[in-house]
Each structure stands twice: as C-alpha cells, then as structure tokens.
Design a protein with these regions (language model features):
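N-terminal nucleotide-binding beta1-loop-alpha1 segment
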Residues: 1-19
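A short, N-terminal amphipathic alpha-helix
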Residues: 31-47
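Acidic donor-binding segment of Leloir-type glycosyltransferases
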Residues: 45-70
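Short phosphate-binding loop-to-helix
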Residues: 64-97, 156-157
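Short aromatic-hydrophobic micro-motifs that form the base-stacking/packing surface
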Residues: 99-101
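Conserved donor-nucleotide/metal-binding helix-loop-beta segment in metal-dependent transferases, i.e.
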Residues: 108-134
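Short, glycine-/small-residue-rich phosphate/pyrophosphate-handling segment
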Residues: 142-164
Length: 212
C-alpha cells in the first residue's frame, strides 16, 4: 500500500467567513489549523506524501516544513476542482491510495489515521468520515484515487456515497470522533474547547477568539 494525503486549502483571506474574524485573526487561525494537521499527518507511518493544493503562497511556505508536494490552484473554483488537480498528479505516480483531509481538523491524531486505514481492506473501495454535524466530509479514502469523482460543497457526505456507489460496492462510513471535529462555526469552537482534547491547540483557539 502506497498512500498520499491531499489537502485542498483556500486562500486564507477568503476562508472561514462564518467565524466572523478579522482578516489577520483568520490568517492566524488558518495557519494554526494547517500546521497542526500537517504535523499529525507527517507523523503517520501510513502516509508517504502530502499534496497541498492552493493558491496561497503562505500555505506552500508552511508545507515546505513537511516536504509537501505543491500544486497551484490558479482558479480556486472549489474543492472538487482542487482534488482533480491532485488526481492528475497522482495518475502519473505509483500511489495506490489517497486520503483527502480538510485543513480544519486539528484534533485528529496519528492513532485516528491508523484506525481509519484499518477499514481499508478492499482494492476498490471508498471510506468516508463525516463531520460532527453529518453535513460534510472530514476524511475520504479512495482506492484507487481515480475510483470516483468527489462531490464536496453539496451539503452532505451522502453525495460522496452516491458517486462511490456508481463505481464500487465497497464503501463504508467510519465514525472516528476526533476526525469528525472541525472548525467551521463559533458553535464548533465552543464544542471543541469543552472537550479540551489538545490543550495547547485549545489555548491558542481561546486566544484567537478572545475567550480566555
């Protein structure tokens, strides 16, 4: 098994608008989330390479610390297009699996990644971890990477399964708590602070949102 991770990253100035932060606080938050996610993935023995797809130079500067592949997303026309750019790169490589993560799941651990890949037992398969509210996709393993077209930004992980069902009978939903925790709203922030799973990250979130 040879696996790469794909992380599509929107320009910081256009990200996380629902959080109602200043441009500078949004940038600080995005950097915090991305660095934590990249740090976790880079420590996983199951993932050999990380692919960053973005239009943001600062994203690639952060990615250099983790030896990421850089793919420039000139149009930034959505997550699905970003994934297709990564898929084009993967098609010329020897990776057998890909896993897509968003940048805003900082509470994920390497143990969670191990657990996720324990579900990966079929050659042609799709494994999905939804968000806490079941209104999005927080992890998506595709074996092989081109087995299906992704359907992000449609309001539910179920659309991913509709796409997967056209290509394989092996598709699974994995409920892995820490991967399901993302930062999309103030409610999400309050929820994760109550859990205090990674105290250092929670402290930094409190500082950004001025909750301390």
């Amino acid at each position: 098994m040879k696996t790469c991770a794909i992380i599509p990253v929107k320009q910081f100035s256009k990200a996380k608008t629902r959080l109602d932060l200043s441009i500078e606080d949004t940038r600080v938050l995005c950097k915090l989330l991305l660095e934590e996610v990249l740090g976790t993935i880079s420590k996983s023995s199951l993932i050999e390479k990380i692919i960053l797809v973005s239009k943001e130079d600062e994203v690639f500067q952060i990615g250099k610390k983790f030896d990421c592949i850089e793919i420039f997303d000139e149009t930034e026309s959505g997550v699905n297009n970003a994934i297709s750019l990564a898929d084009s790169w993967i098609s010329n490589s020897n990776f057998t699996h890909s896993v897509i993560f968003p940048q805003d799941i900082p509470f994920m651990t390497t143990q969670d990644i191990d657990m996720l890949f324990n579900f990966c037992i079929f050659k042609n398969s799709v494994i999905l971890v939804p968000s806490r509210h079941f209104d999005g996709t927080n992890a998506l393993i595709r074996t092989p990477s081109d087995i299906m077209e992704t359907r992000y930004d449609e309001g539910s992980y179920k659309f991913q399964f509709e796409s997967a069902m056209l290509k394989t009978s092996h598709y699974s939903l994995a409920l892995i708590h820490r991967i399901m925790l993302d930062i999309d709203s103030r409610d999400d922030v309050n929820f994760v602070l109550q859990k205090n799973i990674k105290p250092t990250i929670c402290q930094k979130l409190e500082e950004i949102f001025q909750l301390s």
